[in-house]
């Protein structure tokens, strides 16, 4: 995909979504048991607007019906782009479909950092998810060094270009971009 075309698509997508209501998304990471997840949902109360939750696999499987009943979009924090195989610890798109998931989290900074997930792998996941009619929440972000050195725009552009390479224009509405400034969320970063 040409640089100019992708830039134009990104601008159009951002402009279109800015006209819509806000999306509130929560990644539960490796937190919340099924019981804790249910308690959280009870405290949350009725949902007004678009809410997305990405719980751990065990909680996802058990609370899928509760998420649906409350109108919450839900999905896994990770998945494999192949439908089956000897991939210990992974979950496939057919397995995810059985749970009624609507959106898949892709490219989270912890997946990129702790598991060395590359933009090439993220690209494969996005292509697989979109080909199976899932929507995707793509996480992009820069670390503190990239931020301080003024390279943050270059980093974000690279992630977008490589993660979305070759994507047809008709798939853009099925992608939400989540900007996660990694430097703000590390344990050492001051919180405000």
Regions found by a protein language model. Give the residues of each.
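Active-site loop-to-helix "anion-binding N-cap" substructures in soluble metabolic enzymes
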Residues: 2-192
């Amino acid at each position: 995909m040409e640089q100019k075309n992708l830039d134009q698509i990104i601008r159009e997508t951002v402009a279109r979504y800015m006209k819509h209501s806000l999306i509130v998304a929560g990644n539960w990471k490796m937190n919340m048991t099924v019981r804790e997840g249910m308690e959280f949902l009870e405290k949350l109360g009725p949902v007004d607007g678009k809410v997305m939750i990405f719980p751990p696999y065990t909680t996802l499987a058990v609370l899928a019906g509760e998420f649906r009943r409350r109108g919450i979009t839900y999905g896994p924090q990770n998945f494999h782009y192949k439908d089956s195989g000897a991939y210990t610890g992974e979950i496939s798109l057919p397995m995810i479909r059985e749970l009624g998931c609507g959106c898949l989290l892709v490219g989270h900074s912890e997946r990129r950092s702790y598991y060395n997930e590359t933009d090439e792998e993220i690209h494969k996941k996005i292509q697989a998810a979109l080909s199976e009619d899932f929507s995707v929440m793509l996480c992009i972000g820069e670390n503190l060094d990239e931020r301080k050195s003024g390279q943050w725009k270059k980093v974000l552009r690279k992630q977008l270009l490589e993660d979305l390479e070759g994507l047809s224009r008709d798939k853009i509405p099925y992608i939400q971009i989540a900007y996660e400034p990694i430097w703000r969320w590390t344990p050492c970063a001051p919180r405000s």
